[in-house]
Amino acid sequence: MKRTDSTAKATAPNPPLAPLLVILGNTGSGKSALALKLAREIPAGIVNADSRQIYSQMDIATAKPTPAEMSEIPHYLYSFIQPDQPFSLAEYQSLAYQAINKLHTQNRLPILVGGSGQYLKAVLEGWSIPQIAPDETFRAAMFEKAEKEGGASIFAELVKQDPQAAAKIDPRNIRRVVRALEVINKTGAEFSKLQTKNPPPYRVLKIGIHLAREELYRTVDLRVGKMLEQGLEAEVRHLLEQGYAATLPSMSGIGYRQIAKYIGGEISLSEAIEQMQFETHRLIRQQNTYFRLADPDIHWITLEESMDSGIINLVRNFLADGGKE
């Protein structure tokens, strides 16, 4: 019997999903170096997933790729907004999808690189993010309350209004707590109820670089000294002289906040260094809540393995499996 058109359509194979490579891990683990290594071997482009590397004029403490590296390989979402420019997670997600899709049209493999768990999850899980404009008056009031009464005071308010959201937000992340309260205040709905997921049509390979915690601590401690040698103090002074306030969200990043305090005479240089190292260690522990060794979706490798040719073969096989490359 002749098959109908509808039957033929029903049995037609689905088109192959577009590939996406993700390189993740702790700060200082060598993600950018691995991305560059792969992009030199396989037609690719690099998409930033680090919430600190989006800002222009803030290069040293954020450990961005160098201008030479960015001119050699296509890079997206680096240094594209000013330090005082508001920028939301929803905006990042939209721009990341645009960059990924653009690379696909160029027959390049998109490599999403970063250690900002929220950025990565928003893209990979397809979060539906509330499109709520910032309420600067509300934010100022919340930040003032946190300053006077401690961050626990506003986190307690979030626990009261939306316990599900509070369970997923680090109470030390004041900006995220304030954002959740802001959305609740403007919509009258629980923040957690407004976040749904619709994963994008990508075939994903996640590669994580793992270093033992003590080894990673030593690496980032040495990197703090190197940042100062590279001119971090001058970079922060230049930002302050241009009128960028030390209280800006962009200036809350590790390195900028502490050096701004040193420049302002609040702490000594040695205290600034100690605080930078302490905060980086804390960031590493926080990142470990996003990037778990037990996660079966992540192909974990050591730093030594990231330098080996085997990692290139892994990516080539991933592309070949989907009929890409």
Swiss-Prot record:
Top-rank EC class of the record's enzyme: transferase
**A GO molecular-function annotation:** ATP binding
Under catalytic activity, the entry for this protein gives: adenosine(37) in tRNA + dimethylallyl diphosphate = N(6)-dimethylallyladenosine(37) in tRNA + diphosphate
Which protein are we looking at?
A: tRNA dimethylallyltransferase
| Gene behind the chain | miaA
Question: What quaternary arrangement does the UniProt entry report?
Answer: Monomer.
Annotated binding of ATP, by residue: G25, N26, T27, G28, S29, G30, K31, S32
Q: Which Pfam families match?
A: IPPT
Cofactor(s) demanded: Mg(2+)
Its BP terms in the Gene Ontology are: tRNA modification
Q: SUPFAM superfamilies, alphabetically?
A: P-loop containing nucleoside triphosphate hydrolases
This molecule's function is given as: Catalyzes the transfer of a dimethylallyl group onto the adenine at position 37 in tRNAs that read codons beginning with uridine, leading to the formation of N6-(dimethylallyl)adenosine (i(6)A).
**Sites where the protein binds substrate:** T27, G28, S29, G30, K31, S32
